[in-house]
């Protein structure tokens, strides 16, 4: 009664897990009676495969994501091991080992929440404001940008006749780069975009695995999309526009990332190392990304402020105790907001007033402990609103468990 791996790790390692059959060749007489053994090959048992996954963290993530579509990915910053890889909703893959019924298969295919999609490695989302970390780091690392430079956020920035709006209608007032990360001020990043070349930003983003494969050792990973000038010409037959850079620097527009990529982005920012994620246990060392340590430290401190200072967007999800968490919230917009809607007396339609499919995705990415990073975690909760409301609290509870038992 052999069973075969049909997806994921089990499919990739099926030959190792299965082993091989043995056999014996006999000489028999005319009656079929065995006279002697001629040749024999012993069966080879299947190998045990060790992974980095931690069952308790997997269970905790599934528990936290109950009733929520999305994904949770945790990477160990020391060895690149995937400690948690959860896609929600899921299904019982053991039902497939003996053949699934047509009724069950049709139900899975027709489920509007698509449980067959492994969102952790193949779900594609605009990263929203979590990507501002890369924009900010690129500005101070490669564009000689003064991190203390201030811009005034009135609630919008003009590019020609077009207005690009901040999420905060009344604006943030005067902010520097650290404030802009902490408060997630869109207008500050629009001003950065005025001075940025999209191709340079795109190339730097790939250092952090945005728009490129992570190298994880399981099949069916998608590489997402980091747009640039050549992509626009090739796929749209049009030249790149400056307004598209405005959208890109805040993680919107054409850009798409997987939850795994966002977790890996965070791990690489936290460590400054070219971490390569792995499900299968192996001992490895990672090369340096050669990013200026002072610039990385600036991003680290800004992420710390997001979670641990009163006006940070994730302050309500800060950790108590000695081990602190640094992070970045993101709200991934899935619809276009018209000028008429923005100028309504009541303002932009609230997320909860929209139909489910038009609501924003809630995103949070973080690492801990702050002074000695071990865990990098990304949470995406589809159509659940701002990153601070849903994804950040989920991440907090999962991180608390990881720090309490697996530090």
Language-model segments: which ranges?
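Conserved, well-ordered alpha-helix/loop/beta-strand core segments that scaffold catalytic motifs
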Residues: 31-71
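Amphipathic, well-packed alpha-helical segments that form the structural scaffold of globular domains
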Residues: 14, 18-21, 62, 66, ...
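Short, charged, low-complexity patches
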Residues: 6, 262, 387-400
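Short, gly/Ser/Thr-rich active-site loops of penicillin-recognizing serine hydrolases
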Residues: 286-290, 300, 394-407
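Short amphipathic C-terminal alpha-helix that caps PH/PH-like domains
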Residues: 9-13, 269, 394-402
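Short, well-ordered alpha-helical scaffold segments within catalytic/effector domains
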Residues: 54-58, 362, 396
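Carboxylate/His-rich catalytic cores and anion/metal-binding grooves
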Residues: 3-27, 69-97, 201
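Beta-lactam-recognizing serine transpeptidase/beta-lactamase-like catalytic domain environment
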Residues: 28-38, 78-129, 134-379, 384
């Amino acid at each position: 009664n052999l069973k075969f791996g049909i997806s994921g790790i089990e499919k990739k390692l099926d030959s190792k897990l299965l082993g091989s059959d043995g056999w014996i060749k006999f000489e028999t007489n005319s009656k079929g009676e065995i006279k002697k053994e001629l040749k024999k090959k012993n069966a080879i048992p299947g190998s045990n495969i060790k992974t980095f996954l931690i069952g308790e963290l997997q269970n905790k993530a599934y528990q936290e994501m109950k009733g929520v579509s999305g994904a949770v990915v945790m990477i160990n910053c020391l060895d690149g091991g995937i400690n948690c890889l959860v896609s929600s909703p899921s299904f019982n893959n053991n039902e497939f080992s003996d053949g699934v019924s047509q009724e069950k298969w049709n139900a899975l295919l027709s489920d509007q929440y698509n449980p067959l999609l492994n969102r952790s490695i193949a779900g594609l989302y605009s990263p929203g404001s979590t990507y501002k970390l890369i924009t900010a780091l690129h500005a101070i690392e490669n564009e000689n940008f003064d991190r203390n430079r201030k811009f005034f956020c009135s609630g919008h920035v003009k590019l020609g006749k077009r207005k690009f709006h901040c999420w905060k209608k009344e604006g943030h007032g005067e902010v520097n780069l650290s404030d802009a990360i902490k408060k997630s001020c869109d207008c500050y990043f629009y001003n950065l975009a005025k001075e940025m070349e999209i191709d340079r930003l795109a190339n730097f983003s790939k250092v952090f695995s945005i728009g490129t494969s992570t190298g994880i050792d399981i099949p069916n990973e998608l590489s997402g999309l980091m747009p640039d000038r050549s992509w626009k010409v090739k796929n749209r037959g049009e030249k790149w526009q400056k307004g598209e850079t405005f959208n890109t620097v805040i993680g919107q527009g054409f850009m798409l990332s997987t939850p795994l990529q966002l977790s890996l982005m965070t791990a690489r920012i936290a460590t400054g190392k070219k971490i390569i994620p792995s499900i299968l246990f192996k001992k490895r060392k990672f090369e340096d990304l050669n990013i200026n340590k002072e610039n990385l430290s600036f991003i680290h401190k800004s992420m710390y402020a997001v979670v641990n200072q009163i006006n940070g967007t994730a302050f309500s999800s800060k950790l108590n105790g000695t081990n602190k968490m640094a992070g970045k919230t993101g709200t991934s917009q899935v619809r276009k907001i018209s000028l008429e809607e923005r100028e309504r007396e009541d303002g932009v339609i609230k997320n909860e007033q929209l139909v489910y499919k038009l609501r924003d995705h809630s995103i949070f990415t973080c690492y801990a402990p702050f002074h000695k990073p071990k865990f990098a975690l990304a949470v995406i909760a589809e159509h659940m609103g701002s990153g601070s409301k849903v994804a950040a609290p989920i991440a907090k509870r999962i991180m608390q468990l990881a720090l309490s038992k697996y530090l």
